[in-house]
Curated annotation (Swiss-Prot):
Keywords: Ribonucleoprotein, Ribosomal protein. Residues 45-59 have a biased composition (Basic residues). GO terms for biological process: translation. This is Small ribosomal subunit protein bS21. Residues 39-59 are annotated as: Disordered. GO terms for molecular function: structural constituent of ribosome. Belongs to the bacterial ribosomal protein bS21 family. It comes from Prochlorococcus marinus (strain SARG / CCMP1375 / SS120). Pfam families: Ribosomal_S21.
C-alpha cells in the first residue's frame, strides 16, 4: 500500500503530486486495469512476453 506523510510546511498539492508519483512507480493503475477487465489467454501471454523482454533489455 502506498503511503505519503505530509510535512508541516508542505502543501496539499505537493503531497498529492508525490502520492501520484509513488502510485505510478508501484504500478497500481496497471494492476487495476488488468483486474477490472477479463484478460484472454492470448493477452496474458503477450503481457508476459512484453514484461520478459523489458527485463532482458535491462540486463
Amino acid at each position: 500500500m502506498t503511503q505519503v506523510i505530509v510535512g508541516e510546511n508542505e502543501g496539499v498539492e505537493s503531497a498529492l503530486r508525490r502520492f501520484k508519483r509513488e502510485v505510478s512507480k508501484a504500478g497500481i493503475f496497471n494492476d487495476l486495469k488488468r483486474i477490472r477487465h477479463h484478460e484472454t489467454p492470448v493477452e496474458k501471454y503477450k503481457r508476459k512476453q512484453r514484461l520478459k523482454n523489458r527485463t532482458k533489455r535491462r540486463r
